[in-house]
């Protein structure tokens, strides 16, 4: 698969301390999805999608159960989605999606991460117009044409299907991601490495040397924040 999706898979199978952060972030996401709808994935498509991704990230059952049980309770804890945009070195662009119970804290933390790691916060919309929201599905396979035909027959709005190194990558309109998954399952595909809604950069930049190291430090600082759910960028091979 492409380097970008290989990196996503690597993060999902990270070890030691990184796992606890990933599990905690999924716990919040599962809680919010269950709280906003029914705590049953069969009647709550948003929860079903989060649980699918949690499975890929090998989130333990007890973490999932705890989040769903919390949503069933009488807790009044409220989480708010947020998006921040900014710039790194040499034309690099970053989108940060958050889920937080304290917007002021999160905004300050994201701004600090940018400021202390060679980046600059931008205004809303200053970066996102250079990205396109897409559904992305990655799984083992080789015949891109056959997968494309399966999805077309299921009336899925599929944009592209790529095959590389024994891996299929499907790009769909974001509203058709669930439909594409169901179509693939109906055709016998059960295991998926990536099922995500992604912000895909329209163009990428290549960083080297100090610029690349600075950028990696900035991304690490952003992803280390407990309130940050996803970080998107336009740097190639990262």
Swiss-Prot record:
Protein name from the UniProt record: Probable transcriptional regulatory protein STER_0242
Sequence similarity: Belongs to the TACO1 family. YeeN subfamily.
Main location class: cytoplasm
GO molecular function: DNA binding
Keyword Transcription regulation in annotation: yes
Family annotation (PANTHER family): TRANSLATIONAL ACTIVATOR OF CYTOCHROME C OXIDASE 1
Keyword Cytoplasm applies: yes
Pfam assignment, any one: Transcrip_reg
GO CC, any one term: cytosol
Keywords for the protein's UniProt record, in alphabetical order: Cytoplasm, DNA-binding, Transcription, Transcription regulation
Subcellular location: Cytoplasm
Species the sequence originates in: Streptococcus thermophilus (strain ATCC BAA-491 / LMD-9)
GO biological process: regulation of DNA-templated transcription
SUPFAM superfamilies in UniProt: YebC-like
Lineage: Bacteria, Bacillati, Bacillota, Bacilli, Lactobacillales
NCBIfam families: PRK00110.1, PRK12378.1, YebC/PmpR family DNA-binding transcriptional regulator
